A protein has these predicted regions:
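Aromatic (often tryptophan-rich) hydrophobic motifs at membrane interfaces
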Residues: 66-67, 108, 117-121, 237-350
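A conserved beta-strand-loop-helix scaffold within acyl/acetyltransferase catalytic domains
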Residues: 11-14, 21-73, 78-88, 138-155, ...
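Acyl/amide activation-and-transfer machinery of modular secondary-metabolite enzymes
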Residues: 96-106, 153-160
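Conserved acyl-donor/pantetheine-binding loop and adjacent beta-alpha core of acyl/acetyltransferases
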Residues: 82-102
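Short catalytic-loop micro-motif centered on adjacent basic/acidic residues
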Residues: 132, 194-195, 308-313
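A generic secondary-structure signal for well-formed alpha-helical elements
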Residues: 41, 127, 209-217, 302, ...
Length: 369
């Protein structure tokens, strides 16, 4: 374990829960953070120090992670990013911000309800404008029971594939027949797949992702310029390049091609668990079933790497998207995102967004890609 001076301390125990914690150290020392990350079986790479490095490399955030130690030596880490140029009582912090995936508390064996409640209490006492917490869906029960009454909760639904039993079990018992058939169809049609961990394939992924945003804008009755402006602000190419650079081999970029033309791509973060972080496809080539083949290969690789779960992200209220994920054996997990704020900023933001949507006659679309 790690003392608050940032050095490994032998002989300390990780497995004794308590609701007594020391004052937080921020930013969290990286060696302690890495130890806690690897000892939490539900951890995702979006909770890693490398992920924070990637977010900070974009120039939009600063590391505001927090390290706690219990009276019995158990370490807890809360990854946290602070929006640049917001400080003190005007600070805007999140674990993690929108567009940056799952955050939330890390602990050896996973956080307990008592630990979540204690950290919530510590956060609530800080003079910070807003603190947004997007926890791991696998820890939903601890967060639901530990959240205070003044934490605003937003219901979410995530889909995860349980990889226990290995790929043969997942393929034969969890993948539906239509998905297995789709993967074989893609191979017969000549779809080829490449996986890279150097960032070399980011440009191909990003072109497909940008095309998908343009397509979504038409389906959702949103002006294309508005959708693309938001896309380049929230998901610039430099963001994905930073992720690939900072995570290295833990960031896989998969690209499916037909006659050398990229037709589908996804970014998978691989650690204790696999995280299907982003995916996009060329809608003109859906008949090739490239997504089915990509998912077969990515899930197989996650099983081979020893991942316990394959996280397919949130599904929102889209029945179509949920059904797509369930074809590959994913199951829904209900959980909540939490917000601590000193002023009703979220209420104002939500009202403005709804007003814009009404003005452009925006309609939700259940989309894949």
């Amino acid at each position: 374990m790690m003392s608050f001076r940032g050095h490994l301390t032998p002989g300390r125990r990780f497995d004794i829960p308590t609701t007594v914690i020391s004052p937080a150290i921020s930013p969290a020392p990286r060696d302690a953070w890495e130890v806690v990350l690897r000892s939490d079986p539900n951890a995702l790479e979006s909770q890693s120090p490398a992920w924070t490095d990637a977010a900070c490399a974009t120039g939009s955030f600063e590391d505001a992670s927090r390290l706690y130690e219990t009276v019995d030596g158990r370490l807890l880490v809360l990854p946290m990013l602070r929006r640049r140029h917001t400080v003190g009582a005007l600070a805007v912090e999140a674990s993690n911000p929108p567009g940056w995936g799952v955050g939330g508390l890390l602990a050896p064996g996973g956080p307990t309800t008592a630990e979540v409640a204690t950290v919530f209490s510590e956060l609530a006492g800080r003079r910070v404008l807003t603190q947004r917490l997007w926890p791991n869906p696998l820890a939903a029960e601890s967060w639901a029971e530990g959240a205070p009454d003044n934490a605003k909760g937003t219901e979410r639904v995530a889909h995860l594939i349980d990889l226990q039993g290995g790929f043969d079990h997942v393929w034969s018992k969890l993948f539906e027949k239509s998905s297995r058939r789709g993967a074989r169809h893609a191979e017969r049609e000549g779809v080829t797949v490449e996986c890279d961990t150097t960032g070399r394939l980011i440009p191909e992924f990003y072109r497909l992702h940008s095309q998908a945003v343009s397509r979504w804008s038409r389906l959702q009755h949103e002006p294309e310029w508005m959708a693309m402006r938001r896309h380049h602000r929230n998901d610039p190419r430099e963001k994905f390049e930073a992720i690939a650079r900072c995570l290295g081999e833990r960031c896989q970029v998969w690209v499916a091609r037909i006659d050398r033309k990229p037709i589908a791509s996804m970014i998978v973060l691989q650690g204790n668990n696999a995280y299907d972080f982003r995916a996009a496809m060329d809608d003109d080539y859906t008949s090739y079933r490239a997504n089915d083949l990509l998912l077969r290969l990515a899930v197989c690789d996650a099983c081979r790497a020893g991942c316990r779960f394959y996280y397919m992200g949130d599904s929102g209220h889209s029945v179509t998207l949920a059904r797509f994920k369930e074809r590959f054996g994913a199951r829904p997990y209900d959980y909540a995102e939490y917000l601590l704020e000193r002023l009703p900023i979220s209420t104002v933001e939500r009202g403005l967004k709804q007003a814009v949507k009404r003005a452009i006659r925006f309609r939700e679309a259940g989309l894949i890609g």
